[in-house]
Amino acid sequence: MLKLIQNNREITALIAILCLFGLLSVIDHQYFSLQTVTLVFSSAQILILLAIGATLVMLTRNIDVSVGSIAGLCAVIMGMSLNAGFNLPVSCLLTLLLGMCAGFINGALVTWLKIPAIVTTLGTLGLYRGLMLLLTDGKWIEXLPDELKRLSAPLWLNISPIGWLLMILILAMAWILAKTTFGRNFYATGDNLQGARQLGVRTDSIQIIAFSVNGIMAALAGIVFASQIGFIPNQTGSGLEMRAIAACVLGGISLLGGTGTVIGAILGAFFLTQINSGLVLLKLPAWWNDFIAGFVLLAVLIFDGRLRCAIEKISANKNMPVSSKMTKVIR
């Protein structure tokens, strides 16, 4: 039973989502509807993108706490390039390239210079955030063109063009990780680094790719942010890194690497966003968001630790010789 829970964390996250829907529907009978699902999905798009990127990094037994700053910096570059007269496709391309470069720098520092990921990304968190503020002089970027805002305008089934593209991206990432050798290399790298190297996996390249894709996802999150609200505040992306990590852990991505699925991380992101909508429904202040995200992260980590210890204890008892078991009983 315990192994079933450990190996099917996506189902656990889905049950949590349905239970929360049920609870909030008791408070407001109109809450449980297709319109609510699409609204929560729209609000969750930024966190989902960050969770996809964080999944790859965490699968390789690393962590990136700079994604919020990368998303903010990329949103600023997006806004500045549009206001400078560049068209939307060119601005998006520049933004994605910047995100990839920022992620590549993180990956290179971790793999080539052997600096721990948490230390590296704490440093680049401040670096990218400071660069963002230097570029904007601490001011907001406004007057973004309508063509950018149309990317987040509801289209078919009340889902925006970005929403449909995101669903295609989710399916593609899930297929790559589950069905391809390239995707399984991320699991192998995080599960047993030395063993993966002996099997011929280019673990350094895999880790750099994970960080680079994470940067691209953060850049996409920055584009979505700018598209949804139509301007770019000077604190864009602040605090998103913790929520992305919490979403992944909630969805079954292990901080020890090599375990979890991108679908689980996305369900975790949806659940955290759903909590936000619940706070609005209950008319609670917005600053409860970070408290709840931190609480959920700690609770899931404690649960994971206790679950892992229980499974290891059961396995040890099963593998214990009969004579040893009898000796324990006699004592």
Swiss-Prot record:
Domain of life where this protein originates: Bacteria
Keyword terms, alphabetized: Cell inner membrane, Cell membrane, Membrane, Transmembrane, Transmembrane helix, Transport
Main location: membrane
Gene Ontology CC terms: plasma membrane
Subcellular locations according to the entry: Cell inner membrane
Membrane disposition: Multi-pass membrane protein
InterPro entries: ABC_transp_permease
Transmembrane intervals: 14-34, 39-59, 70-90, 93-113, 115-135, 157-177, 206-226, 252-272, 284-304
GO molecular function terms listed in the Swiss-Prot or TrEMBL record: transmembrane transporter activity
Family: Belongs to the binding-protein-dependent transport system permease family. AraH/RbsC subfamily.
Complex formation: The complex is composed of two ATP-binding proteins (LsrA), two transmembrane proteins (LsrC and LsrD) and a solute-binding protein (LsrB).
PANTHER family noted in UniProt: ABC TRANSPORTER PERMEASE PROTEIN YPHD-RELATED-RELATED, AUTOINDUCER 2 IMPORT SYSTEM PERMEASE PROTEIN LSRC
Biological function: Part of the ABC transporter complex LsrABCD involved in autoinducer 2 (AI-2) import. Probably responsible for the translocation of the substrate across the membrane.
Name of the protein in its database record: Autoinducer 2 import system permease protein LsrC
Source organism per UniProt: Photorhabdus luminescens (Xenorhabdus luminescens)
Record lineage: Bacteria, Pseudomonadati, Pseudomonadota, Gammaproteobacteria, Enterobacterales
Gene name in the database record: lsrC
